[in-house]
Amino acid sequence: MEQQPRKMNAFDWVLIFSTLALAVLFVISGILPNLPLFQATIFGQDIPLFMLSVWAWLFLFWIITNVKRMTGVRFTRSNKIALLVALSVLLLYYAYSLMTRQFIYYWDYVLYYRMQVGISKSFHADGFFNGIIDVIKSVWYNSYSLLNNVFLAAPYTFVPRTPNLFVAISAASILPSLYFLIAMFIKVVERFIQPKHGSLFFIGGMTLAVGFPLIHRALLFGQPDLLGLIFVFLIILLTISYDFSKTDFLRYFLLIVLIIMTCASRRWYMFWLVAYFVCYGVYVILQAILKKRWSDVKRTVLFTLATGLTLAVVFLPMIIVVLRAHYSVSYSAYNVSGFSGELKSQAQYLGIGLLAVILTGTVYGIVKSKTRALTIFALIDVFFTIFIFTRIQNMGYHHTLILVPAYLLLMLICFGGICRLEKRWMLALSSTVVLGFCGVNAAVCATSSAESLPSPFSNVALIPPQRTDIQQIRAVNRWILEHCSKGESAYIIPHGYPYNPDVFRSCDYPDFSVSKHVPYGSAVLGTHYFPDDLLLAKYVLTCEPFCNLSLAEKYNTAFLSEIPQKHFTQVAQFDMGNGYIFYVYERILPMDREEIQFYQDTFAQESKQFPELFSVVWDELIKELK
């Protein structure tokens, strides 16, 4: 059965003309990069980058409108009110959280902010053509791509360039689209479950989604990886009820585009893509074989081949990088407990309460024939995703976003079973217990900054640790700025929490002055290079008690040993007011062969395992001596 051609609408033409306009600008910028248009700004933002960002959102909204039409989802008045209330509650909470926090974004929490500042400078300095090339290269070669920053460039144009406002703009940009798609997802799942109380099911589903802490942790801490979840839900909506029984070229196009966007958003979303499409492909082909619908098998295979070929062409440089890299070795510091340990971590992330809801949904879904396939699919998807992910590393809070759709589906199945109850007192009691606990769980997480929460609740504190030492950190920064001239650096050895180099670098953003003198630091075996600043920096800082991560304490012990200390003298110390004291050492003798040899001997084992991260650095230092 072939699809009927769809009539073009106004939105289609707007997208076509805007795409052509951007393509023309791209070509012209490659030929005439110095045209005034390519140097023009709006509120300090490069206008061509602003236009690219607007186009990206336009394209995404076009996809969403097409997916909504293809799924046939219709919202009732009560559905729209519930969605609006849910978004209002979320945005108010995000605003409150940002206005009341005393937090310094560091490491992955601040990386997207830095990239946002960087992409603006790069488009303005290098031009529109080279800016787009940089975005493409970041997708191919970097662990963090600039795709998310392209989407956020236009909204971020109109606010001061602070980390808190970056998080605020990310939330205001991403959450409405994401929860609109989650609302569509709830309506589609409703068709499978067929609850007797549809309005209650939708309101309960939105309550479960809004109060699910794992959705919010990454974004509240400065990581807008949530954008990729928009693409994930779009893929699910396009496939959940499609079995290749008819040809649908627009659906194929949208799926391929969304797969590309998902991969480009964050590389680890590929684990979800592999697990999901393996499960989906096996299910569709088995169904077709059992029903002897060979044309469905043919369409599935042809779509798979077309998708694979497209991805191979688009991501060829990335594929080469991935195949050449040994991530299981270089990321070994992040693989702390493997598959079994990750299952335990996921149980802790969820908490006993939500785990009980998910397990209840699993049992109910398997028992009921209408939801059996969907439930088994979700279970296999979760375990398969975790299994392949832990071949490389364990999952952090942001990585767990790829499990959110399956978790949410199983919770919806549980609540859908409740909404099929006929006795009103049973319906009222069960709904109150499930939604009441989820509300309490959300409140506990939303008001906590503790590292560990009671086991009945999700171990996902949504309030960042509140700092009381910001003035002390600024005092250290002022000292560094006063004592370091251009080209001089101060290396900070601690690399854990509460202190690491990035805490000092990020303290006064958007003022980047300290970052010019304080390097990012080095600690993670297999990922970070040997810190040559131990031998090159004018100042080296350490603290007591020490803040360790991976190799940081070994670097600290080595630095405080006799041979390196012959080259330094202590010149200052800072009481941080919380039991930590920082000591500043100034280099009084230049590095020599004895000092280099000491580090070579101390880290011989690490160099044997990762020569490109150690020996290569030492060889360069020896060349400098010569």
Language-model segment annotations:
Residues 66, 165-195, 234, 361-366:
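Transmembrane-helix motifs of polytopic, lipid-linked glycan transferases
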Residues 462-492, 497, 506-626:
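C-terminal luminal/periplasmic domains and tails of membrane-associated envelope-modifying transferases
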Residues 142-180, 218, 222:
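Loop-to-helix entry region of an early transmembrane alpha helix in multi-pass inner-membrane enzymes
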Residues 99-110, 123-150, 171, 345-349:
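Membrane-proximal lumenal/periplasmic loop motifs of glycosylation machinery
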Residues 217-227, 396-397:
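Short acidic/glycine- and proline-prone juxtamembrane loop motifs at membrane-interface regions
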Residues 112, 118-122, 273-283, 287-371, ...:
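Transmembrane-lumen/periplasm boundary regions of multi-pass, lipid-linked membrane glycan transferases
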Residues 1-95, 199-202, 298-307:
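Start-transfer (signal-anchor) and selected internal transmembrane alpha helices
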Residues 432-482, 496-502:
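Membrane-proximal, lumen/periplasm-facing interface regions of secretory-pathway glyco-
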